[in-house]
Swiss-Prot record:
Keywords: ATP-binding, Cell cycle, Developmental protein, Kinase, Nucleotide-binding, Selenium, Transferase. It comes from Drosophila melanogaster. Transmembrane segments: none annotated. Plays a role in apoptosis and consequently a role in imaginal disk patterning and growth. The keyword Membrane does not apply. This is Inactive selenide, water dikinase-like protein. Gene3D superfamilies: PurM-like C-terminal domain, PurM-like, N-terminal domain. One of its GO terms (biological process) is negative regulation of reactive oxygen species metabolic process. Belongs to the selenophosphate synthase 1 family. Class II subfamily. GO terms for molecular function: ATP binding; kinase activity. SUPFAM superfamilies: PurM C-terminal domain-like, PurM N-terminal domain-like. It holds the Pfam family AIRS. GO terms for cellular component: cytoplasm. The lineage of its organism: Eukaryota, Metazoa, Ecdysozoa, Arthropoda, Hexapoda.
Length: 398
């Protein structure tokens, strides 16, 4: 049997049963008869959301895909309510169906390994795909597909251990989200990639069009920043040349705590955050991923109906990662809002009078904080971070 055929066989077994049930212990390569030096993150030259094409370049590349919907006579309507068509530029596509009152909400995403635990990598990949639906206030996903490229640099033993673990993590996260993985595509490739497609059919009242921010709203962020810094710092523990750059500002214990905080944050679904958007009358949201906090805030601001701008004053950051970022010079640009995040939190425009209750509710339901980080003011549809933002150190959870 060929290597590619083996991959497909492993995929079928994992998605339809036959995998090892004892998968929730922290990944130890030696426990699976792999070399102690095995690192999943070595099977790609880029890390996580570092695979993103720069935002300005991407806008030019996809311009040919844009459609002129203004040429249509009118938007589809249901019960005398216009159903918007949302395409390139936001988190999901929202396409009115020919069946009255229903829309297809769909998104796709993939990236390279960012952590070395294959099971957690699968969970993070699934959470990252679903996050685009959650950013639209959609809380129920009807179906998922998995997209997986197995590195040709893996030995058969490495492949047979790692790939089922990734798939199990992806599948378990989908089950946690109340959906299932019904198929996908598995290929071989020089670099390992993991991702998927999330689709749902819903009525207009089940999603929140992200264009209704008004002056006086506040900006809420539901996960801390600094995931990219944390995973890089963790890898540098074994790289003396890089570790020497940061060891004066952070200890190994600090880095390991930050890494586990980042890993758990990335694997956590934004589903509760999305559900509460409806309860507290959110005016729009986006999720923070590869373009960083400021990049995604600028995209969201640019799509608002009213002449508003976003001003960010506070930056919740995984503990000690702001110091690490500063020690690395301009490498991450974390405090400037340009550091990539993977499966980050939702950035939500909420009425000022309801934002505190939203934050309190999310902490009550999930045990995690959310933060008011900025305001919506009159402006020209831009976003900025003030010169000296307040950094909120977010400690690891016990």
């Amino acid at each position: 049997m060929s290597y590619a055929a083996d991959v497909l066989n492993s995929a079928h077994l994992e998605l339809h049963g036959g995998g090892d049930a004892e998968l929730r212990r922290p990944f130890d390569p030696t426990a699976h008869d792999l070399d102690a030096s095995f690192r999943l993150t070595r099977f790609a030259d880029l890390k996580g959301r570092g695979c993103k094409v720069p935002q300005d370049v991407l806008s030019k590349l996809v311009s040919a895909l844009q459609q002129d919907y203004s040429a249509q006579d009118q938007e589809p309507q249901f019960l005398n309510v216009a159903i918007p068509r949302i395409g390139i530029g936001l988190d999901c596509s929202v396409i009115p169906l020919r069946h009255g009152g229903l829309c297809l909400v769909q998104t796709t995403d993939f990236f390279y390994p960012i952590v070395d635990d294959p099971y957690m990598m699968g969970k993070i990949a699934c959470a990252n795909v679903l996050s685009d639906l959650y950013a639209m206030g959609v809380t129920d996903c009807d179906n998922m597909l998995m997209l997986l490229a197995v590195s040709t640099k893996m030995t058969e033993k490495e492949r047979d251990v790692v790939i089922p673990l990734i798939m199990r993590g992806f599948k378990d996260s989908a089950l946690e989200a109340g959906t299932t993985v019904t198929g996908g595509q598995s290929v071989v490739n020089p670099w390992c990639t993991i991702g998927g497609v999330a689709s749902t059919i819903c009525q207009p009242n089940e999603y929140i069009v992200p264009d209704n921010a008004v002056v006086g709203d506040v900006l809420v962020l539901t996960k801390p920043l600094g995931t990219q810094v944390a995973v890089n710092a963790h890898q540098w523990i074994d790289q003396p040349e890089r570790w020497n750059r940061i060891k004066l500002v952070v200890s190994e214990e600090d880095v390991r705590k930050a890494y586990h905080r980042a890993m758990n944050s990335m694997a956590r679904l934004n589903r509760v955050a999305a559900r509460l958007m409806h309860k507290y009358n959110a005016h729009g949201a986006t999720d923070i991923t590869g373009f960083g906090l400021l990049g995604h805030a600028q995209t969201l601001a640019a799509h608002q109906k009213k002449d508003v701008s976003f001003v960010i004053h506070n930056l919740p950051v995984i503990a000690k990662m702001a110091a690490v970022a500063k020690a690395c010079g301009n490498m991450f640009q974390l405090l400037q809002g340009h550091s990539a995040e993977t499966s980050g939190g939702l950035l939500i425009c909420l009425p000022r009078e309801q934002a505190a209750a939203y934050c309190k509710d999310i902490e009550k339901q999930e045990g995690y904080q959310a933060w008011i980080i900025g305001i919506v003011e009159k402006g020209n549809k831009t976003a900025r971070i003030i010169d000296k933002p307040r950094v909120i150190e977010v400690p690891a959870k016990d």
